[in-house]
Amino acid sequence: MERKSYVFGNWKMHKTAEEAKDFLSVFCPFVKEISPASIVGIAPSFTTLSACCESIKKMDSSIWLGAQNVHQDSSGAFTGEVSLPMLQEFHVNFVLLGHSECRHIFHEEDSTIALKVGAAARSGVVPVLCIGETLETRESGTTKDVLSNQLILGLAQLPETASVIIAYEPVWAIGTGKVASTADVQEVHAFCREVLSRIFSKEKSETISILYGGSVKADNAEGFARCPDVDGLLVGGASLDPQVFANVVGNFNL
């Protein structure tokens, strides 16, 4: 079974509803014109999901809509949280889970992330499990140990037949302008696939898409596309401008 390719944009805490609609009015036609092999998606803030959902539907676009996080319970006394049923009202296709900013700023633990991954998968929303090492980890030579643990613990609640996407984002490369070499990225992705084969099976590991994120731009997207174990991109800052993001999508799909 051939792995699917994805290029997702993570808007983080950027764009109002009006700004999101303006973005999509420009970006959706770009995507239609490029007609990429990759599935293209955006993960806006919670407050812009409604506007994005409306715009995507209005323009009859194939763009996937994603969320940046979710609570593992469907309802309850969890002030400030958002549930999967709430996301599904906006036809959300995927949800980012375990992003390094959630891990390090908000102290999300692997056990909680695992519950979120399982809940998303059971609800029919594709979980995108984000993993990555810090600069300290990289320099200490323990990158593979950290990534292996994040995969094993983060996927502990995933139903056996459910779909999942992995996004490798080295923390030291997010928003820093530092970019991992294509050789380094391929080595890490191949290692992650090996870990996935131990968690599941060799056959299933070959069906799981692994995305790369970390200062991805239009001028390095094509290089990552040549890596056999890089199945897509998770794009941060370069996804905020419709023309720039379209160039990233186009270059990854040359």
Swiss-Prot record:
Its EC number is 5.3.1.1. CDD domains: TIM. InterPro entries: Aldolase_TIM, TIM_sf, TrioseP_Isoase_bac/euk, Triosephosphate_isomerase, Triosephosphate_isomerase_AS. Keywords: Cytoplasm, Gluconeogenesis, Glycolysis, Isomerase. Substrate binds at residues 10-12, 175, 215, 236-237. The active site is at residues 99, 169. One of its GO terms (molecular function) is triose-phosphate isomerase activity. It catalyses: D-glyceraldehyde 3-phosphate = dihydroxyacetone phosphate. GO terms for biological process: gluconeogenesis; glyceraldehyde-3-phosphate biosynthetic process; glycerol catabolic process; glycolytic process. One of its GO terms (cellular component) is cytosol. Its main location: cytoplasm. Pathway: Carbohydrate biosynthesis; gluconeogenesis; Carbohydrate degradation; glycolysis; D-glyceraldehyde 3-phosphate from glycerone phosphate: step 1/1. It is an enzyme of class 5 (isomerase). It is found in: Cytoplasm. Pfam families: TIM. Involved in the gluconeogenesis. Catalyzes stereospecifically the conversion of dihydroxyacetone phosphate (DHAP) to D-glyceraldehyde-3-phosphate (G3P). Homodimer. Belongs to the triosephosphate isomerase family. HAMAP family: TIM_B. This is Triosephosphate isomerase.
